[in-house]
Amino acid sequence: MRVAVVGVGWYGFKPVVPELSFREMMFEAAVRAYEDAGVDPRRDVDAFISCQEDFWEGVAISNEFAPEPIGGALRPTITITGDGLQCVGQAYMMVRSGAFKVVAVEAHAKPSGIVTLQEVYEFSLDPVIRTLKIPNPLFQAGLDAAAYMRRSGVSREHLAMVAVKNKNRGLLNPRAPHSAKVTLDEVLNSKPVVYPLTRYEIAGFTDVAINVVLASEDVARRFGDKHVWIDGVWWATEVGTGAIEWHEWGRMPSMKTAALGAYKLAGIEDPLRQTDFAEVEDRFSYMELLALEELGLGGDGVHRLLEQGYYNPGGGYPVNPSGGSLSIGVTLEATGL
């Protein structure tokens, strides 16, 4: 049984959405997704999934806010404390099981309304035992970037080239509020945040709500034929971010494991030749290159392919043609969508 994305809706994609609460944003995105899919949530949708986290909402047991805004009142509704892409994976399995025909997936972010955003980041790193008095919670990204550079031979210029590519590409995306026309020198000489990363190499935050509707093949056919078919889904888990003593610096083995599993399901043996483009993690500039390496999209020579323009929009294999998170912004649990 194949699974398709039959509808998508969103609201926001701005650094600040002052006019609506996160629950109202969820509602607006849901209405647009159901209209795009041509479904009635009270009649056609069998289950609902929301990706959210108590710390971001500022409310304990925040899943109690999930059903009403997305049409899931008195219906099967579950919440996942993780990225929206995990919700898609869960919905995919639910549909493949045969127990559900149509599943709606929702994820949102309103970081502009989080007064203690810095403190939330600090708390996630276990400040009680492991990371006492760490002035900048982004230190892990700096350590990881430095380890990756040392292992791979990637230079500061290569990291900056990723930011230049994605920031400039985002200018063509109306949903990329952090895009900018920048040069290599401007990125390298911008304000240092945590070595080796500068301001332009760290994604900002964006308010958004996104809703995606998945359906089984037989149902999807009834809603037309212009769908996005999901051929492979896989995931793997590493140690948590707080367990820095166990982290394999400069590598991302969980991403490699997940990619190999997804490729196998989709029947892909050579991803660089059998796929046309990739949207990968880039909330920090170095992560795009590390992700490409772990995904098998260039091997150990990804930085040399970057130099040649291979990953540019007009190159042999465009990467993050949307502008990535460096242009769109970090949308908390909605980033994967």
Q: Model regions: which residues?
A:
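Beta-strand segments within the central parallel beta-sheet cores of soluble alpha/beta enzyme folds
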Residues: R42-Q52, I78-T79, V103-H108, E157-V164, ...
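Condensing-enzyme catalytic core mediating Claisen C-C bond formation in acyl metabolism
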Residues: M1-R23, P127, M161, P192-G261, ...
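Short acidic, glycine/serine/threonine-rich loops at helix termini
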Residues: V17-E19, I114-V120, L171-R175, T241-A243, ...
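Conserved catalytic cysteine-centered active-site region
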Residues: K14, Q52-V102, E106-Q140, H178-G204, ...
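Conserved active-site "lid/cap" helical segment
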Residues: M1-D83, Q90, Y148-S155, P177-E186, ...
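Short glycine/threonine-rich loop-to-helix capping motif typified by GTGT followed
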Residues: W56-E64, G242-H247, D282-L305, T331
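N-terminal leader/propeptide and maturation segments of large enzyme subunits in energy/redox metabolism
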Residues: I134-L184
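Electropositive phosphate-/nucleotide-binding environments in soluble metabolic enzymes
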Residues: E19-F27, A60, L85, P135-G142, ...
